[in-house]
């Protein structure tokens, strides 16, 4: 069968068009890839073959961006319009929230918005650190390399951006181009969260199962306050099978998109969610809320209750108290003049009827010794992880840069005494690991995985405000004493 005809059949079978529309669909495809058609010759998806055909027909230049833009234009044909997508989604919602997210996620996989093939390239494994914490490690290989033309375009970009950012509603159906994300096949579910219009979409390069984004339809900065907790509860009521959380709203400890209010969620049980309570806390005015300090490398207070109003009220008071709490002996400073340094990373999930809220305490102070952040991965870890510790990593899933896949292969050669091109930045760590282990061809992969787990444990320890040692426990006690005195 000819490639154009095959893809036209796929478009019609998707339900986006009717059989009567076949000639129309074929002409839409021809407008994108050229009139010359060919017999399919391999097992590659028809859309991918059509992109190759478009290059051959000189409809597009042969570069990463042009291929990506055309790919998404083709899959847009196989995707219901935004209004139809929303209509189907909310019809299914009447039966089951799981059924409608199953349907929407499959749609986003089938139309290649969720890059399933690229995501499968990621390195993923888990392990238990010497401190007893279960952790997950990923090396991110799914995002495509930067197109040189896109880099140049971004460097020379002037004037007002459209869309204003990568999370704005205006991305839905946006063609994209050099320096701009292709989003022809993006669909966003419209929803109401606590009286405000929000959107719900999936992440194209997912870091975990059904990785989704909830975004304010208005381009406003991120903020963590009582409204945040209200919003998280509202989302959990709609999607109880998903967790939802927010990155912190300050630089260094926050995510990379502070300019647009949004949350992340999905269907994944992170290590932090499975971690137990190491010390219970009593709040007399909140008998329906079970509270405690979580046994975790970062500083996490957990609140659990089937009464969401109590949870929101107590959680908001804890956030406000932390925002103004200082312990200068431990470099914990709430303010420097008018500059706020404290916030939290709030994360919520459901356990039956209970709402479980984790409030991870964050501090973005810097010092001469730690210019990138006192509570940020320290310099000896930068060869593995230098980037900010955001929501996903807070919960125990490392997102490590793609460069490490090849670099760590060279480290393994070094351990085995083979010729290698190991980066100098890894040498001190590699020597330490080698001195502590009998490394052979049989166990070198296991040693590498365990060593990365230990590095990630230390990354999280560095980001925690109260360390997992005697001094950290004293710091926790001092904080909890002051907190429970303030909140009866």
UniProtKB/Swiss-Prot annotation:
Pfam families listed in its UniProt record: GalP_UDP_tr_C, GalP_UDP_transf
Record EC number: 2.7.7.12
Pathway the protein acts in: Carbohydrate metabolism; galactose metabolism
Keywords: Carbohydrate metabolism, Cytoplasm, Galactose metabolism, Nucleotidyltransferase, Transferase
Highest taxon of the lineage: Bacteria
Cellular compartments annotated: Cytoplasm
GO terms, biological process: galactose metabolic process
GO MF assignments: UDP-glucose:hexose-1-phosphate uridylyltransferase activity
GO CC annotation: cytoplasm
Entries under NCBIfam families matching the protein: PRK05270.1-3
Protein name: Galactose-1-phosphate uridylyltransferase
Organism: Lactobacillus helveticus (Lactobacillus suntoryeus)
Lineage, top ranks: Bacteria, Bacillati, Bacillota, Bacilli, Lactobacillales
Gene from which the chain derives: galT
């Amino acid at each position: 069968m000819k490639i154009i005809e095959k893809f036209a059949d796929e478009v019609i079978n998707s339900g986006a068009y009717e059989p009567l529309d076949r000639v129309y669909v074929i002409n839409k495809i021809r407008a994108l890839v050229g009139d010359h058609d060919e017999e399919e010759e391999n097992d590659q998806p028809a859309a991918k073959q059509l992109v190759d055909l478009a290059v051959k027909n000189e409809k597009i230049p042969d570069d990463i961006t042009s291929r990506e833009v055309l790919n998404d234009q083709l899959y847009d044909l196989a995707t219901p319009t935004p209004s139809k997508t929303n209509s189907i989604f909310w019809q299914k919602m009447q039966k089951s929230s799981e059924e409608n997210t199953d349907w929407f996620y499959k749609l986003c996989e089938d139309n290649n918005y969720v890059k399933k093939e690229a995501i499968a390239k990621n390195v993923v494994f888990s392990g238990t650190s010497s401190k007893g914490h279960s952790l997950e490690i990923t090396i991110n290989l799914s995002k495509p390399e930067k197109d040189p033309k896109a880099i140049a375009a971004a460097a020379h970009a002037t004037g007002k951006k459209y869309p204003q950012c990568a999370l704005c509603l205006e991305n839905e159906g946006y063609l994209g181009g050099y320096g701009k994300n292709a989003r022809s096949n993006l669909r966003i579910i419209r929803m109401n969260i606590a009286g405000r219009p929000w959107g719900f979409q999936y992440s194209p390069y997912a870091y975990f199962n059904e990785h989704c984004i909830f975004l304010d339809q208005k381009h406003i900065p991120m903020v963590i306050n009582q409204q945040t907790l209200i919003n998280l509860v509202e989302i959990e009521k709609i999607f109880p099978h998903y967790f939802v959380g927010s990155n912190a709203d300050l630089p260094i400890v926050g995510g990379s998109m502070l300019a647009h209010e949004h949350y992340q969620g999905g269907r994944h049980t992170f290590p932090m969610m499975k971690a137990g309570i190491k010390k219970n806390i009593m709040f007399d005015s909140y008998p329906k809320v079970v509270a405690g300090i979580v046994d975790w490398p970062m500083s996490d207070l957990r609140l659990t209750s089937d009464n969401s109003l109590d949870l929101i009220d107590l959680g908001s008071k804890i956030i406000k108290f932390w925002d103004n709490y200082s312990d200068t002996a431990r470099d914990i400073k709430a303010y420097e003049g008018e500059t706020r340094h404290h916030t939290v990373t709030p994360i919520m999930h459901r356990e039956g009827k209970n709402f479980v809220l984790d409030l991870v305490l964050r501090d973005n102070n810097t010092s001469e010794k730690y210019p990138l952040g006192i509570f940020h991965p320290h310099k000896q870890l930068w060869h593995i992880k230098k980037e900010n510790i955001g929501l996903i990593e807070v919960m125990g899933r490392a997102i490590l840069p793609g460069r490490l896949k090849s670099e760590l292969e060279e480290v393994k050669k070094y351990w085995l005494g083979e010729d290698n091109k190991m980066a100098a930045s890894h040498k001190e760590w590699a020597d330490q690991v080698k001195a502590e282990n009998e490394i052979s061809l049989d166990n070198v992969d296991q040693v590498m995985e365990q060593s990365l787990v230990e590095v990630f444990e230390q990354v999280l320890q560095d980001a925690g405000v109260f360390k997992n040692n005697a001094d950290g426990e004293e710091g926790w006690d001092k904080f909890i004493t002051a907190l429970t005195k303030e909140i009866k």
